[in-house]
């Protein structure tokens, strides 16, 4: 909640809908948390076995450095920052459609990307970005370390739950890797992104 309290006062909601504009900051925080289930996005959860996130993160970073030596690493960082943040935006848009049945128009999607670029002018965005190099490397590390096999053994009777656990673990590791490499908080980024998606939803619903 401390991060939310720091970020939300900076968010301006210029939306012609009284019920939304009149929301207090605490109510707005609860709204964002409920719509995007942010409490679960950064979980302290049990994966059915011992998981050392920091160790996996460091191994992923080592593999990334090994694959991108010298000046290649700086090129990789520039491209990956674009891809990673863009994929976060696309994932939030997709989750709004899946969990809340709201499909944003192409113009509203573009507005979200434009708003995030305005808030973070040093980050170039790409609307077409999907899977990131960090996530791919994290998934491979989870498999090669034997963690995937352990989680599969624990949840073999429920493959949907297994897939959810793997997705959550991959996202958790990926966020930790991004935070350390770029010295930025994915939690802060996610809250800013979620706020912009929520504003787009209200704008769209107000025009329909």
Swiss-Prot record:
InterPro entries given in the database record: Bac_effector_IpgB-like
Family matches, as Pfam families: IpaB_EvcA
Alphabetically ordered keywords of this record: Plasmid, Virulence
Protein name, entry field: Protein IpgB
Organism: Shigella dysenteriae
Gene name of the encoded protein: ipgB
């Amino acid at each position: 909640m401390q991060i939310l309290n720091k970020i939300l006062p900076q968010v301006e909601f210029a939306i012609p809908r009284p019920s939304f504009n009149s929301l207090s900051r605490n109510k707005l925080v609860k709204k964002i948390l409920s719509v995007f289930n942010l409490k679960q996005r950064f979980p302290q959860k049990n994966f059915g076995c011992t998981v050392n996130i920091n160790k996996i993160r460091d191994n992923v970073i080592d593999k990334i450095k090994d694959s991108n030596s010298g000046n290649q690493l700086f090129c990789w960082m520039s491209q990956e920052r674009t891809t990673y943040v863009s994929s976060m935006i696309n994932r939030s848009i997709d989750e709004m459609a899946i969990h809340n049945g709201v499909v944003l128009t192409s113009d509203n999607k573009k507005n979200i990307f434009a708003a995030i670029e305005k808030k973070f002018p040093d980050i170039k965005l790409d609307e077409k970005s999907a899977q990131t190099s960090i996530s791919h490397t994290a998934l491979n590390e989870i498999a090669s370390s034997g963690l995937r096999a352990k989680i599969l053994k624990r949840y073999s009777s429920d493959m949907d739950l297994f897939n959810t656990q793997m997705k959550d673990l991959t996202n958790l590791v990926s966020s930790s890797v991004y935070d350390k490499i770029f010295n930025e908080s994915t939690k802060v980024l996610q809250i800013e992104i979620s706020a912009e998606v929520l504003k787009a939803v209200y704008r769209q619903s107000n025009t329909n």
